[in-house]
């Protein structure tokens, strides 16, 4: 079977379980998925997940089913709860794209899949063009939405910005659109780095003002001596954020600001406590659905 073929997994959930499924998929590094309301119902959604065949053998798929069953609190012996099918690469490209649409974020941004023409009614928006390929989504996750919503309210003109966990590069692109003079993007997945570079090029025609780094945040800032950052945006999982906070503090200049997202509302108090312990001043907390975004600052009188 061709290595570029895909498994498509389909199942149905109660609509209020969407966020916990998204959280788990992100935790597992799975980014090719969609949710759709079932016809004539508002409380059920159909979940579609695409997984590359060459990376998911029978044992891996079985383990994945058990993870989802545990998450949904259902018996993993239920017949036909999961529907697996095989999608050829050329068919995957068609089936995947049909679930994407332009998305307005905040007051100023429009995330636009690159194969969709811009409607004239959006000419006054800051356009973020995205072609995520096989690995990354188009920014519809609430944590990305919260980051963009907060970023558009922050003065980034002529500032040095660090994007931790860049993924498809949406937040790096947004920072440049908002006037950042330099954007540093870090991700530990080479596919993400490729996607960030590709989408930045798609939006600006070049890679000027962008530096990308492959590796973990703690490794990269030590190796490349990233310092005196004006603004950090960190959209990853809470457990990873907790480990990064001391070094994020060190790489910020005085009065530098940071946004943390990818945090469930139930996790925000613990993150805030760690921020304060590391001499970061809490400025604001916002939320969307089950997710929180924390905005903080390194105070001027701190070293």
From Swiss-Prot:
Location in the cell: Cytoplasm
GO biological process assignments: methylation
CDD domains the UniProt entry points to: AdoMet_MTases (cd02440)
Enzyme superclass (EC): transferase
Main localization of the protein described in the UniProt heading: cytoplasm
InterPro entries in UniProt: Ribosomal_L11_MeTrfase_PrmA, Ribosomal_PrmA_MeTrfase, SAM-dependent_MTases_sf
GO cellular component: cytoplasm
Binding site for S-adenosyl-L-methionine: 144, 165, 187, 235
Molecular function GO labels: protein-lysine N-methyltransferase activity
Cross-referenced SUPFAM superfamilies: S-adenosyl-L-methionine-dependent methyltransferases
Keyword Transferase listed: yes
Pfam family, one: PrmA
Catalysed reaction equations from the record: L-lysyl-[protein] + 3 S-adenosyl-L-methionine = N(6),N(6),N(6)-trimethyl-L-lysyl-[protein] + 3 S-adenosyl-L-homocysteine + 3 H(+)
Keywords: Cytoplasm, Methyltransferase, S-adenosyl-L-methionine, Transferase
EC number: 2.1.1.-
Function of the protein: Methylates ribosomal protein L11.
UniProt similarity note: Belongs to the methyltransferase superfamily. PrmA family.
Record protein name field: Ribosomal protein L11 methyltransferase
